[in-house]
Every structure is written in structure tokens, then in C-alpha cells.
Amino acid sequence: MYRPAIGRPRVLLVVSHPSVGAGLETIFRLERRYEVRRAAKLAEAASWARAWPADLALVDALLLRGGARANLGVPALVLAAGASEAAAAEQYVDKPGGWVAKDSAAADLVSAVERLLTRPAEASAGSLALFAIGALLVVLLALLLYLMWTAVA
């Protein structure tokens, strides 16, 4: 489940190519705003996701070829060569948050990560609201039954 970052946002990089991964890690570390971990495989990323809950994952589309799934439990940006590769890869991410081009400038990459980290959470009905609606329905049903009973009697 997505948790808004209280301290420094945690970014999990999932990139198989060592040089590309090191470059991305350097970009985020130079910002001095993020905690960064890097995984070279999806299985390693899933292990990191359990041990080190990230706020966002940046996943290389190449790792998602052949139907491999990235079930990381956090919003994920897909790092892709183009829109068609991104669209194909996003279906294999459990919480897609868009994509960023592999040839993006460092500032654009950081900006895409910031947009995803700061977007408002999806609204959902809380348990108290659901309980109140359920209680209201029970009361209305009881009232309807009472009115039907008094009309027959």
C-alpha cells in the first residue's frame, strides 16, 4: 500500500543494466532528497519491497517483457524507450503511475518522480462511512417493514 513519505521519499530502482542503474542511482543521490535502493531483477525488487517499503519504484520496461509482473505494492514509473513500449509494460505493474522516456534529462526524470510522489491519494470510503451507510440501510428497512405491518393490521 502506498504510504506518503514523512522523511525522505524512498525510491526503488529496478534496472538490470549496471551502468544505467548506477547512473540513475547517482542522479537521485545527488538530489540529496531521496533514499535509494537498486535491484537488478524483479525477484530482487520484490524482496526489497518487503524489507524496505519504498514510496515509488522506477522499473525498466525491459524487465517486464514476456509477461513478467512487478508486484511491488507501490506506484511505479516505467522507464521506457517510447509510448508503445511503456503501454505494453504498464499492464505488468501492479500500480502503474505513468512512464518516463529513457532518454529524458535528469531534471525531467526527477520531475516525473516528484509528480508521482506528490499526487493526491485516490479517495476511498472509510470504514466509518461504510458502517454509517449500512446502519442507515438497516434503519430504513426496519421502517419499511413497520409501515407494511401497520398497513396490513
PLM feature segments, named:
Residues G73-A86:
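A short, hydrophobic beta-strand element within the central beta-sheet of small alpha/beta folds
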Residues A83-W99:
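Alpha4 helix (beta4-alpha4-beta5 surface) of REC/receiver domains from two-component response regulators
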Residues E31-R37:
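A generic structural motif
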Residues A40-L56:
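Acidic, metal-coordinating helix/loop segments flanking the phosphotransfer/catalytic sites
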Residues R8-S19, L24-F28:
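Conserved acidic segment of CheY-like receiver
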Residues L58-L62:
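Active-site residues of response regulator receiver
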Residues S104-V113:
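C-terminal output helix
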Residues A121-A153:
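C-terminal single-pass membrane-anchor helix
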